[in-house]
């Protein structure tokens, strides 16, 4: 694979945009745009003569990268339909289907008879660190100067005198998105670098989405929408889990004898009742689960270093990826692709360790995203990597391994 030039994924200017559609019988349609680098902004109303033509001209300018928040699933389909000639009533119908029925853009194209615009576009919704967090919450966390709620219900038919309030609200959201765009510069720069390396547009993807897109391309895997989860999955401890603790051995036996029910809705294994009970181990108590191990005895802890006491924090490099490799967990992709997956994953791991030890942070960070993001997709029912048995094996084995370490450390005199 020949890396592409970084310039393939960058444009001179960022056009941050937001869309408003308000009303039922006589809806109004507004697009607000701010050109970040030029400090210019403009509002485009459907009812105002010439505005849609001006917006169309702006959209055709190849110097712009269009940036929005959740814009891939809402704003861009709406603007695309408007540029295809739809009026506000038709746009409102599309808006309702996008929001209430959660239809995807490609479904909207078929149902409403338009094509998505091919503008250069970044949606920062998945790039931002939270999951399903609103723009207003990000604005609050960043200390944005003003938080404005829409002063009207989205079904209200507005009077012309009320239009300026809608425009003020829309531009405030554009400003918040602009702040978020700047806040995410490091994350977006990394995505541009990785897009150039792998030849895929990764700029709007979360870490896990990037990992899936890259490895899918390398292995030529296909996605077929939502998977049919199995009714149950089981667990078997890998060979590297060994201990003389009767408590841990009892947990291993219970886990091995359990059929974990898989939720048919989200595809995740459900926690059996016995895992809800805290485990007493040495000096502490611990809560196991599908997600991870949590201590319950040290809700608050204060330790001060001194001449006699050293406080250390040890980081385990790529913990879950190491569990995947050392346990020999191979996805059932068929046609030898599971084995190729593990080989590719192991190669990525060794490349990351080399980059980390040599001080190449850019490469190390990008490969870390691939490693951790891939694990994150094992439990996603929509992912090509969906494997609830492997997700369970990774998380449970990781917890048992930590418990074995805790047990061994507490046997050391003075620990």
Task: Mark where each language-model region is.
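N-terminal accessory regions of nucleic-acid-interacting proteins
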Residues: 1-12
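A short catalytic or substrate-binding loop motif that flags glycine-/basic-rich loops and adjacent residues
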Residues: 9, 23-27, 305
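Two-metal-ion RNase H-like nuclease active-site motif
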Residues: 12-22, 122-123, 312-314
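Conserved beta-strand and immediately adjacent loop positions that scaffold enzyme active sites
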Residues: 13, 30-32, 310
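Hydrophobic side chains in beta-strands
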Residues: 19-21, 35, 373
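Short, flexible loop/turn motifs enriched in small residues
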Residues: 23-31, 365-366
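Short conserved beta-strand segments at catalytic cores or DNA/RNA-binding microdomains
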Residues: 27-39, 317
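Conserved acidic
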Residues: 39-415
